[in-house]
């Protein structure tokens, strides 16, 4: 089945099933935030697949602000997301460039924090994230983007683990929009395995 031809509702359901099957694991894990958890979500097997990225880009694009001229995110989780959205936007004849925020500055040359076709200073950029737990990674990306002279109003995430990210992001004056929360992912994984 071609996911491009599906409706938004069926695209969401299909993406949720892909995430539950390929991105979610139950066990004992240490998260990037340092927290221990029985639930692990690694979206890369989905975001690095053609169908997964098409579904995701289709669902994310309507949430990117109209005045946003770029999408950006912290490497590595956001790399396929920003590329997929830039391509989906181009297919709709919308200019939306992809930017990648490094975890530390490039060690040579320009020593850049941000890679990609940089927009004019003051431009609105939407930040993308695969999974949010505390919001730390997202806010690090926002900090570097803001220091570079750009404006961020919202963060789009695939999965919100519901462990404080929304509150921390809101405290920073930003809006968090997530396609799914951890409870939805856990339930779909249970449904698939039963």
UniProtKB/Swiss-Prot annotation:
Swiss-Prot/TrEMBL GO biological process terms: 'de novo' UMP biosynthetic process; pyrimidine nucleobase biosynthetic process
Catalytic reaction list: orotidine 5'-phosphate + diphosphate = orotate + 5-phospho-alpha-D-ribose 1-diphosphate
Domain of life: Bacteria
Keyword Nuclease found: no
UniProt enzyme class: transferase
Enzyme Commission code(s) on record: 2.4.2.10
Cofactor(s) it depends on: Mg(2+)
Binding site for 5-phospho-alpha-D-ribose 1-diphosphate: 102-103, 106, 108, 129-137
Pathway listed: Pyrimidine metabolism; UMP biosynthesis via de novo pathway; UMP from orotate: step 1/2
Residues bound to orotate: 133, 161
Entry-linked InterPro entries: OPRT, Or_phspho_trans_dom, PRibTrfase_dom, PRTase-like
Gene Ontology MF terms: magnesium ion binding; orotate phosphoribosyltransferase activity
Keyword annotations from UniProtKB, A to Z: Glycosyltransferase, Magnesium, Pyrimidine biosynthesis, Transferase
Task performed by this protein: Catalyzes the transfer of a ribosyl phosphate group from 5-phosphoribose 1-diphosphate to orotate, leading to the formation of orotidine monophosphate (OMP).
Known partners and oligomeric status: Homodimer.
Protein family membership: Belongs to the purine/pyrimidine phosphoribosyltransferase family. PyrE subfamily.
Xref: HAMAP family: PyrE
Protein known as: Orotate phosphoribosyltransferase
Lineage start: Bacteria, Bacillati, Cyanobacteriota, Cyanophyceae, Synechococcales
Gene: pyrE
